[in-house]
Amino acid sequence: MGLAGGARVVLFVVAAAAAAALTAAADQIFTSSGAPFGRNSREPRYHVEFHPVDAPFNPENGQESVPMTSHVGKHYTCFLPVEETKTMKSIIPQNATNVIIESERRVKPKDPDELLEILKDQCFYRHEGWWSYEFCYYGKIRQVHVEGEKVIQEYVLGEYDADATDAYYENQTSDSADEDDNLIDTSKRYHVHLYTNGTVCDLTDMPRETEVRFVCSEPTVVISSIKEISSCKYVLTVQSPMLCKNPLFQQEKRTLSIHCNELLAEAEATVDDDSLPKEAQIIIPDPDGLHNYAAYAT
C-alpha cells in the first residue's frame, strides 16, 4: 500500500496504536483537530520505541513507514508492525475517538513446523551462571561450561527426534504439559519438539532428554528458559515471533512494536505535513518526555 493512496489508512493505524501504547501519555496524542484518539481493548498491545539518528531501526522489506511529529516539533519516520500492514484492509474514521478496522479476507494459517522452518540450521544460546546452553533447531542441545576458550564440561541434553515428536502428538493428552507455573493454561499455546538420546545420566543410567517448547513471543527468537524438571529431563522454552502468525498460538493481546527513527535536521525540512490529510496529521509525545517509558494498553 503506497503512502499517497493509503496515508489515511496507515496513519490511523498508528494513531490507534499510539493511543493504546502510551497509556500514561494518551492525552498527549491528538488529531489535527485537537481531539484525542480512544483506546480499543480488543486491539493488540503496542510498544513505541524511539531510535536516535546514530542508531536507527532497520525496517524489513515492505514495512510501511509513516511521518510523525513530536509535540516539540521533532520529526520521525515511524515503521508499523509488518503483520499489521499486511492484515489491515481499511480504516474508516467514524469520529475523533473511534476507528473501525475491516480485516483482510481470512487466509488459512501455516502449521507450526512450516512457520518454524526458517530456524533450520540455526543455533541459539543462553548463559546461566556456571552453564551455557546451545540449542540447534533440528540438531542438538548442549550444556557446557567454558573457561577462557576451553570447554571444561559438556553434556548433550538431546538430539532432535522426529519419531518421538510425532508420537508425542499422536498420544497427546491434557496431561502432556508439565505443571509449570509459567505455562499453566497455555498447553495449546506452545509447539513441542522432542530431543532424545543425550549424554547418559549418572543418576538414572538413562540418556538425557529435553522437551523444547516454542511459544509465540516478539520481537526476536531467544531461549527464554531452561529447567530440569526431573533428573536429567529438561524443558527448554524458545520465544518464536514467527509462531505468532498462527492464531492458535497468539496470546489474547499480542505486543507489537512501532519503531520511530529520528530524522536529521536537513531531512526534517523535507517533511511537509500539509501534504497529508488534516485528520491524519498526528502529534506524538517527545521521547525525552516519556523517560524511556514503555507503556502497554490495559
From Swiss-Prot:
<dbReference type="GO" id="GO:0030968">
    <property type="term" value="P:endoplasmic reticulum unfolded protein response"/>
</dbReference>
<feature type="binding site">
    <location>
        <position position="131"/>
    </location>
    <ligand>
        <name>a mannooligosaccharide derivative</name>
    </ligand>
</feature>
<feature type="disulfide bond">
    <location>
        <begin position="201"/>
        <end position="232"/>
    </location>
</feature>
<dbReference type="GO" id="GO:0009651">
    <property type="term" value="P:response to salt stress"/>
</dbReference>
<protein>
    <recommendedName>
        <fullName>Protein OS-9 homolog</fullName>
    </recommendedName>
</protein>
<feature type="domain" description="MRH">
    <location>
        <begin position="121"/>
        <end position="246"/>
    </location>
</feature>
<dbReference type="InterPro" id="IPR045149">
    <property type="entry name" value="OS-9-like"/>
</dbReference>
<feature type="glycosylation site" description="N-linked (GlcNAc...) asparagine">
    <location>
        <position position="95"/>
    </location>
</feature>
<keyword id="KW-1015">Disulfide bond</keyword>
<dbReference type="InterPro" id="IPR009011">
    <property type="entry name" value="Man6P_isomerase_rcpt-bd_dom_sf"/>
</dbReference>
<dbReference type="GO" id="GO:0030970">
    <property type="term" value="P:retrograde protein transport, ER to cytosol"/>
</dbReference>
<feature type="glycosylation site" description="N-linked (GlcNAc...) asparagine">
    <location>
        <position position="171"/>
    </location>
</feature>
<comment type="subunit">
    <text>Interacts with HRD3.</text>
</comment>
<feature type="binding site">
    <location>
        <position position="143"/>
    </location>
    <ligand>
        <name>a mannooligosaccharide derivative</name>
    </ligand>
</feature>
<keyword id="KW-0256">Endoplasmic reticulum</keyword>
<keyword id="KW-0325">Glycoprotein</keyword>
<feature type="binding site">
    <location>
        <position position="234"/>
    </location>
    <ligand>
        <name>a mannooligosaccharide derivative</name>
    </ligand>
</feature>
<dbReference type="InterPro" id="IPR012913">
    <property type="entry name" value="OS9-like_dom"/>
</dbReference>
<feature type="disulfide bond">
    <location>
        <begin position="123"/>
        <end position="136"/>
    </location>
</feature>
<comment type="similarity">
    <text>Belongs to the OS-9 family.</text>
</comment>
<feature type="binding site">
    <location>
        <position position="202"/>
    </location>
    <ligand>
        <name>a mannooligosaccharide derivative</name>
    </ligand>
</feature>
<comment type="function">
    <text>Lectin which functions in endoplasmic reticulum (ER) quality control and ER-associated degradation (ERAD). May bind terminally misfolded non-glycosylated proteins as well as improperly folded glycoproteins, retain them in the ER, and possibly transfer them to the ubiquitination machinery and promote their degradation.</text>
</comment>
<keyword id="KW-0732">Signal</keyword>
<dbReference type="InterPro" id="IPR044865">
    <property type="entry name" value="MRH_dom"/>
</dbReference>
<dbReference type="GO" id="GO:0030246">
    <property type="term" value="F:carbohydrate binding"/>
</dbReference>
<feature type="binding site">
    <location>
        <position position="228"/>
    </location>
    <ligand>
        <name>a mannooligosaccharide derivative</name>
    </ligand>
</feature>
<feature type="glycosylation site" description="N-linked (GlcNAc...) asparagine">
    <location>
        <position position="197"/>
    </location>
</feature>
<feature type="binding site">
    <location>
        <position position="130"/>
    </location>
    <ligand>
        <name>a mannooligosaccharide derivative</name>
    </ligand>
</feature>
<dbReference type="GO" id="GO:0005788">
    <property type="term" value="C:endoplasmic reticulum lumen"/>
</dbReference>
<feature type="disulfide bond">
    <location>
        <begin position="216"/>
        <end position="244"/>
    </location>
</feature>
<dbReference type="Pfam" id="PF07915">
    <property type="entry name" value="PRKCSH"/>
</dbReference>
<feature type="binding site">
    <location>
        <position position="208"/>
    </location>
    <ligand>
        <name>a mannooligosaccharide derivative</name>
    </ligand>
</feature>
<feature type="signal peptide">
    <location>
        <begin position="1"/>
        <end position="25"/>
    </location>
</feature>
<keyword id="KW-0430">Lectin</keyword>
